[in-house]
Amino acid sequence: MRALRILLILVIVFGGLFVAADRGAVYFAEGQVADRIKSSQGLTSDPKVSIKGFPFLTQVLDSSLEEIDISLDGVSASADGHDVQVTEVKAELKDVKINSSFSSATAARATGSAHISYANLAKSAPPGSTIAYAGPERAAEGQVKLSGPLADVLEGAGVDVPQPVKALLGDRDVSLYSTVSIENGNTVRLRAKTLPTLPIPGLTDQIRDVVDYDLKLDGIPSSIKLDQVTATQDGLRFAGAGTNVSLAG
């Protein structure tokens, strides 16, 4: 019995040492992967990397990791010099083939997602305007609502509005719905669905020039191509998927 107890103690001790060594190796590898991704993808912030699966060391010996989860902070988007915060930037990578130094990594499958709140999205809109949820029916068509005092919106975008025109416009508000799409995996495009009819010739075209614009997403790994956008009650949610996604090297 004493020998059995000693054997059990040794099993527990060595098992604990193995787990500790395995977790230590994971921690080191996560740092290596984060550094490789940051440098190869040109990111401005340090990604948070979580390598899934146990034991890790046997995965390394097989040169294949079950799953790597990546999250990013400090990601922004820009439009005409206006910066917009992008949150909840995440990527989930499956069946990742690696080499011994982690200098190359390729995921058989990958999914990515990101979020922009309406409050943040409004920072890219013409000054004086707001962007909000357009309601369930229009949201289902990928639309958002843009509104604001017409004269303020035009002037906020740098359009010269003469005093006689201001007097004619009075307190008139502009309220329209823009369709949101995503192009090339990193460009958010807003295009007005319809424009109000105004009593001043040429003003409608000027409004379109103001409210139609592109928002470039910066800091998202170039290998993750977002191709879906959904308008929800709390903002825009983006998603994308890919195969044979290269992460480093």
Regions found by a protein language model. Give the residues of each.
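Short, exposed beta-strand/loop patches in secreted or surface proteins that constitute
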Residues: 129-137, 179-181, 227-229
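Short helix-loop boundary/capping segments
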Residues: 148-203
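Extracytoplasmic/luminal low-complexity segments enriched in Pro/Gly and acidic/polar residues
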Residues: 191-249
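One face of beta-strands
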Residues: 29, 33, 45-47, 66-68, ...
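N-terminal beta-strand/beta-hairpin edge segment
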Residues: 44-122, 126-155, 159-163
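Hydrophobic membrane-targeting and insertion signals
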Residues: 1-61, 77-80, 247-249
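Short, solvent-exposed secondary-structure boundary motifs
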Residues: 119-127, 162-173, 212-222
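Solvent-exposed coil/turn segments that connect beta secondary-structure elements
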Residues: 54, 73-75, 94-96, 149, ...
